[in-house]
């Protein structure tokens, strides 16, 4: 698997990085068992380097299946794996509550797939409000679990990974974390490579952790084009933010 080789490359380069994967990449479309077998191979490789794997969330048709696989990994003793939760889904608050019970590390994003109104908030203001609620839950969860921080080599993240380029969402998280007493290095902001580098640099200057999401492998361009095609709003987001470097 190319993903397994990615860990060798990260280690050889000495970069502060871990790996995110989509379960559709590793056999979920064939069967849950095939996917789980491949995922364990990846996690064992990550463990050999004391590294971490983040399972990306895809469209809502496989949300529950993705969470079930994460739970199966937990039952098998894997603790170097985390998940992504999408704020635009109605179910996300309940999912985060359960994930925090097991101290999972959670990346929170708004959500980029087109979903029906009975599954996801159709209005952006509602998505934003839910993002803030979910971010507060993760910050509180980090406090409850002893404020675990990023590992010294940057491979293992803290519990809250707040993936957003929205300054209002970032400001909310900063203010809320300070209010409840979560240290700056007990959460991280996450952004796409090349998007709002000015904001990334400013956050680092302020003492916050910033992780940059970099597509890798030979199929990065088709992946990028699919993400734009999945939802027309993605194109406007990319163009408007790319030129605000």
What name fits each language-model region?
Residues 1-245:
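Positively charged, amphipathic and often flexible ligand-engagement surfaces
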């Amino acid at each position: 698997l190319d993903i397994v080789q990615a860990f060798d490359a990260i280690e050889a380069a000495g970069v502060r990085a871990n790996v995110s994967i989509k379960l559709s990449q590793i056999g979920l479309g064939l069967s849950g068992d095939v996917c789980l077998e491949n995922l364990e191979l990846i996690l064992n490789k990550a463990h050999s380097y004391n590294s971490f794997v983040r399972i990306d969330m895809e469209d809502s048709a496989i949300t529950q299946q993705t969470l079930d696989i994460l739970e199966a990994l937990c039952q098998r003793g894997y603790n170097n794996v985390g998940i992504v939760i999408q704020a635009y889904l109605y179910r996300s608050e309940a999912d985060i509550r359960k994930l925090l019970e097991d101290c999972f590390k959670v990346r929170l994003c708004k959500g980029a797939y087109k979903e029906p109104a009975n599954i996801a908030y159709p209005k952006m203001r509602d998505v934003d409000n839910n993002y803030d609620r979910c971010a507060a839950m993760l910050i509180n969860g980090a406090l409850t679990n002893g404020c675990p921080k990023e590992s010294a080599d940057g491979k293992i993240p803290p519990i809250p990974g707040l993936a957003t380029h929205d300054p209002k969402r970032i400001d909310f998280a900063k203010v809320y974390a300070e209010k409840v007493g979560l240290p700056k290095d007990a959460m991280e902001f996450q952004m796409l490579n090349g998007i709002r580098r000015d904001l990334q640099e400013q956050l680092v200057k302020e003492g916050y952790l910033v992780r940059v999401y970099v597509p890798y492998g030979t199929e990065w361009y088709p992946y990028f084009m699919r993400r734009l095609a999945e939802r027309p709003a993605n194109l406007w987001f990319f163009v408007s933010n790319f030129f605000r470097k």
